[in-house]
Amino acid sequence: MTAHAVRDLEEIVDWIARHDGPDRAQHVLGRIRAAVDALKRLPERGPHPAELIALGIREYRETFFKPYRIVYHVDGARVFISLIADGRRDMQSLLARRLLAG
């Protein structure tokens, strides 16, 4: 997981803990971790984010624990998680800032 993705996950868990309680936050954390762990078995299974396909970018893929989107890329046998975000956010802007700006 990149430092940005770790921070994304911490912010998600903190927000849920404040608004929905620590038990719900731990549940979401466990489900997101399970989705990430599943990538070890079949990393190429995730679709390419539509927002990036529209720009001709097919380097990244995504998996979900709805409403959360986990954006990653595969380099050989390694999977790099680049972004974890609530899919209800403005993903076009978020992906552009995070992935395209460097």
Kindly give the residue locations of the regions a language model identified.
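Generic structural signal for secondary-structure transition and capping sites
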Residues: 21, 37, 41-44, 68, ...
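PIN-domain endoribonuclease scaffold, especially VapC-family toxins
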Residues: 1, 27-40, 60-64
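Arg/Lys-rich, positively charged N-terminal/basic patches that mediate binding to nucleic acids
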Residues: 1-31
